[in-house]
């Protein structure tokens, strides 16, 4: 009796089983979110339907900036190789969107061929028409960096209404399409001629729903002196604060991202540290790709739910027979009030609603009679996905991340910063003396010995209490001094001999010079008499 009820209940209770996060996202989207999107014509208002390639593609990095800020040179610097279609110069050179991707041989795939390839995540770009597709291509080449990531080069953004109109396609809309699908958006600025044109401001505003993906690079910083660089950095932060209306400060990397000698080498250490941080951020993308796709699907589901409430509310307000056109105009003009009503009734955050002005423009061309009434079952399915399925996928994301190395991207400029004497921080701080035959602490040991013998050593060793009296003079916090003690007490007897005391003072000096302490004592810092214990 009532077997259909028990079957339905059983089906609801049984969790979906997925082999990978990508497969899980693909199935959840197709089975639970896509029906809601199609029912309320989501794709006509916001974003085209997702395809399999959107869930399986490699992480993508989108480069955006005004002309001659070094976008193409930045890619050349990363992959250490010229790519097909590459043009570099002081004038606006890159006039196309170029997807730089891995391929068995060097070559160019034109836009019209690219958007019919089901293996590439670009099929929905055909909606932007031939004017765009003629300015879109894929440069493919065998390169180890491109094994892990793909990079999208964009045309330089110009100033003035004429250039915006003459493109023949909606540049900001294309960038917004890419922004939804990429893992990182890098905005490049030229430190030598800092200027944010009106079109660039509009582009940055179009990316406002993706602040978590945005990083800023202040490029060509070696062309100006330190004092000027501080002023330029301040001006950039002030300008960005006016455009990106968020309380969080956007991360800005300062440097000169090309392989030529630095023109003004005063800030070399700063540039090296910033480059290392940026490279680490890019190298983490493959590891975090599944989490990014999961996050984007959640954002899309929340927007689809709000969209369903908006469309169903408009349908509910429309008359059945007379006065449809006048009512439509009234509803479009009063859309802000409908937003507020939905916000109150369904406890939805204001940040989940689509842009009011853009939505009003899109609604003016729609036939409201084709809109659908509210269908709670579709919304319940999406709520169930967000509450249960996504939580299970989150566990799988962590499992997949734990199996991947922290830095997956290899080759190109990334190899130059990894190991060897030119790796970041090599031979500095605790790494000083790593290649020396003599113990690096030995050169300062006579000075430390003078202090050591004033601390009443017994049988050649001083107690922790006596060592503490001297160590606290450094004014370092007890937590740091405790770590130094642990590293210096190599034989773990709770006492320090003359070599261990010298080592403790060397580590204090390392910390006072602004370097980090190692988690474990490096082999080259182990005192000579203790090396038999190692």
Curated annotation (Swiss-Prot):
Assigned protein family: Belongs to the TRAFAC class dynamin-like GTPase superfamily. Dynamin/Fzo/YdjA family. EHD subfamily.
What SUPFAM superfamilies does UniProt report for this protein, alphabetically?
Answer: EF-hand, P-loop containing nucleoside triphosphate hydrolases
- Coiled-coil segments, which residues? 198-227
Q: Where is this region: G2 motif?
A: 91-92
Residues where Phosphoserine occurs?
Answer: 456
Region (G4 motif) location: 219-222
Task: Indicate yes or no for the key word Transmembrane helix.
Answer: no
Record region (G3 motif):
153-156
Protein name stated in the entry = EH domain-containing protein 1
Q: What is this entry's stated membrane topology? A: Peripheral membrane protein
Purpose:
ATP- and membrane-binding protein that controls membrane reorganization/tubulation upon ATP hydrolysis. Acts in early endocytic membrane fusion and membrane trafficking of recycling endosomes. Recruited to endosomal membranes upon nerve growth factor stimulation, indirectly regulates neurite outgrowth. Plays a role in myoblast fusion. Involved in the unidirectional retrograde dendritic transport of endocytosed BACE1 and in efficient sorting of BACE1 to axons implicating a function in neuronal APP processing.
Q: Which Gene3D superfamilies match?
A: 1.10.268.20, EF-hand, P-loop containing nucleotide triphosphate hydrolases
Residues bound to ATP: 65-72, 220, 258
Q: Which gene encodes it?
A: EHD1
- Region (G1 motif) residue ranges read 65-72
- Keyword Calcium in the entry? The reply is yes
Region named G5 motif? 243
Gene Ontology molecular-function annotations: ATP binding; calcium ion binding; GTP binding
Give the main location.
membrane
Show where the Dynamin-type G domain sits.
Answer: 55-286
**Which processes are annotated in GO (biological process)?**
cellular response to nerve growth factor stimulus; cilium assembly; endocytic recycling; endocytosis; intracellular protein transport; neuron projection development; positive regulation of endocytic recycling; positive regulation of myoblast fusion
Where in or outside the cell is it found?
Recycling endosome membrane; Early endosome membrane; Cell membrane; Cell projection, Cilium membrane
The protein's UniProt keywords, in alphabetical order, are: Acetylation, ATP-binding, Calcium, Cell membrane, Cell projection, Cilium, Cilium biogenesis/degradation, Coiled coil, Endosome, Membrane, Metal-binding, Nucleotide-binding, Phosphoprotein, Protein transport, Transport
| Domain topic, free-text comment | The EH domain interacts with Asn-Pro-Phe (NPF) motifs of target proteins.
Give the sites modified to N-acetylmethionine.
Answer: 1
Q: Which organism is it from?
A: Bos taurus (Bovine)
């Amino acid at each position: 009796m009532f077997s259909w009820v028990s079957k339905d209940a059983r089906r609801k209770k049984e969790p979906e089983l997925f082999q990978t996060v990508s497969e899980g996202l693909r199935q959840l989207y197709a089975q639970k979110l896509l029906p809601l999107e199609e029912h309320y014509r989501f794709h006509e208002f916001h974003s085209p339907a997702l395809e399999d390639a959107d869930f399986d593609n490699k992480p993508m990095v989108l480069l955006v900036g005004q002309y001659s800020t070094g976008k193409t040179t930045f890619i050349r610097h990363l992959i250490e190789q010229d790519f097909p279609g590459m043009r570099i110069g002081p004038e606006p050179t890159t006039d196309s969107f170029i997807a730089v991707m891995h391929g068995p041989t060097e070559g160019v795939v034109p836009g019209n061929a690219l958007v019919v390839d089901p293996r590439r995540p670009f099929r929905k770009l055909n909606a932007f028409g031939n004017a765009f597709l003629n300015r879109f291509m894929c440069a493919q080449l065998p390169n180890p960096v491109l094994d892990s990531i793909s990079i999208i080069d964009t045309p330089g953004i110009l100033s003035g209404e004429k250039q915006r109109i003459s493109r023949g396609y909606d540049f900001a809309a294309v960038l917004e399409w890419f922004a939804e699908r990429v893992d990182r958006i890098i905005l490049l600025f030229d430190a030598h001629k800092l200027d944010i044109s009106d079109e660039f401001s509009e582009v940055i505003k179009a990316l406002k729903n993706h602040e978590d993906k945005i990083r800023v690079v202040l490029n060509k910083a070696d062309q100006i002196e330190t004092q000027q660089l501080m002023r330029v950095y301040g001006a950039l932060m002030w300008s960005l604060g006016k455009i990106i209306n968020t309380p969080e400060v956007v991360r800005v990397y300062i440097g000169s991202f090309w392989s030529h000698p630095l023109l003004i080498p005063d800030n070399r250490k700063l540039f090296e540290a910033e480059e290392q941080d940026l490279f680490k951020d890019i190298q983490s993308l493959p590891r975090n790709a599944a989490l990014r796709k999961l996050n984007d699907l959640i954002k899309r589901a929340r927007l689809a739910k709000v969209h369903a409430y908006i469309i169903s509310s408009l349908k509910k307000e429309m008359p059945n027979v007379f006065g449809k056109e006048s009512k439509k105009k009234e509803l479009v003009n009063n859309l802000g009030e409908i937003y507020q009503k939905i916000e109150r009734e369904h406890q939805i955050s204001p940040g989940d609603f689509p842009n009011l002005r853009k939505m009003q423009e899109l609604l003016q061309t729609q036939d409201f009679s084709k809109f659908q009434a509210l269908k709670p079952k579709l919304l319940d399915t999406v709520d169930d996905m967000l509450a249960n399925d996504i939580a299970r996928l989150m566990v799988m994301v962590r499992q997949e991340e734990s199996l991947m190395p922290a830095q997956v991207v290899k080759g190109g400029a990334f190899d130059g910063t990894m190991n060897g004497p030119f790796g970041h921080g090599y031979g500095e701080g605790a790494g000083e003396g790593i290649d020396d035959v003599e113990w690096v602490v030995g050169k300062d040991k006579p000075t430390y010995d003078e202090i050591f013998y004033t601390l009443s050593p017994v049988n050649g060793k001083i107690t922790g209490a006596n060592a503490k009296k001297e160590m606290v003079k450094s004014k370092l916090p007890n937590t740091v001094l405790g770590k130094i003690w642990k590293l210096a007490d190599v034989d773990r007897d709770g006492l320090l001999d003359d070599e261990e005391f010298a080592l403790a003072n060397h580590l204090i000096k390392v910390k006072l010079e602004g370097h980090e302490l190692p988690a474990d004592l490096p082999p080259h810092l182990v005192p000579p008499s203790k090396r038999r214990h190692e």
